[in-house]
Amino acid sequence: MKQLIAKWNRVSLVKRIIIGIIIGITLAVTVPESTKWISIFGSLFVGALKAVAPVLVFFLVISAISRHQSGQKTNIQHILILYGFSTFLASLTAVVASFLFPVHLSLTESAKEVSPPSNITEVIQSLLFNIVDNPVHALLNANYIGILTWAVLLGIALRTAPETTKNVIAHFSDAISQIVTWVINFAPIGIMGLVFDAIVTNGLSALIDYGKLLAVLLGTMCFVAFVMNPLIVFLNIRQNPYPLVWRCIRESGVTAFFTRSSAANIPVNLRLSEMLGLNKNTYSISIPLGATINMAGAAVTISVLTLAAVHTLEIEVDLGTALILSVLSAIAAAGASGVAGGSLLLIPLACSLFGIPNDIAMQVVGVGFIIGVLQDSCETALNSSSDVLFTATAEYAKRRKEGKQVAIKA
């Protein structure tokens, strides 16, 4: 048995999830009545995610902000602006795509009983009350807006704390991230249960819905990578951006696609930055920082899946609320780094903007894990390749202003 478990653990998570999906579909189509107990694995998996997600976000944000260092004399300010602007535009693009190609998900009947906010005033009022929520109450009730607010405030307050205090917080953050990793390792079994339950409850049409959702997600990410990002680069360097874009995707994006980790791709990006002849004092800061906060792919995932839930529940969304979602998704995406399935775990934060309960939001997270084999890989490829892309863009824009020749090798 130990040898069997060891062999199973040596198989990549992507392959294990694919196996889980195949088993779930097979059981649901062939012997649904005698294997109904399979669906409990999906419920347990979602329950574990619901339990760990609030604490994860809380400590992760505190640790990141408390350790932020300011005052370095580098080209970092321009890069940070590019990171933030591109992430917001990616989120806005995802919102537009979701309205042009609305996707409906297969949720349980209890998920239909939602009281959505009636207008933008009610949304803002709810948002403000969630911000000032008691931190303990926010953690217990998965009020992610309140959690995010308290985490940011505590992180800022702890920036002047001794290193020992920051190390303790960082260790807590690492420990919770490890727990999340353990939970994610059960994803194949959990997803098997979720797929089984979805097909038994809704039929094979549920898989078609997932296909539509994946098409909107990947289509939006491709648009961001091959249209929006090159446009941002062109406006900064005033020359053909595609040689730089293609090189970043080829030498950074492809690796990130298979590792599915921005953090693991940092050495690749540092080497590529050196090959591009960039300033080491800049890229040694911007690349690790980008792996933390430059999350255009995560912003797309959060926006698309949140609006898929909104369309499913037939909640009316006005222009003001859509813009707030774009900003909120961009901010939330910055907290998705370094965590397996991080962007999916931040979907409840965006869903809370529309009054969608946490249990329904976690069903959407479950759907995200079902399509996560491709979604997470493409998301990471977009995130990580953009780190080098915008670091190089800022460097080349500075050289152009100084009258220096900028030669980009494809």
Curated annotation (Swiss-Prot):
Key words of the record: Amino-acid transport, Cell membrane, Membrane, Symport, Transmembrane, Transmembrane helix, Transport
Main location, first listed in the record: membrane
Any one of the GO BP annotations: serine transport
Molecular functions (GO terms): neutral L-amino acid:sodium symporter activity
Gene Ontology, cellular component aspect: plasma membrane
Subcellular location: Cell membrane
Lipid bilayer topology: Multi-pass membrane protein
Alphabetized InterPro entries for the sequence: Na-dicarboxylate_symporter, Na:dicarbo_symporter_sf, Ser_Thr_transp_SstT
PANTHER family assigned: PROTON/GLUTAMATE-ASPARTATE SYMPORTER, SERINE_THREONINE TRANSPORTER SSTT
Name of the protein this chain belongs to: Serine/threonine transporter SstT
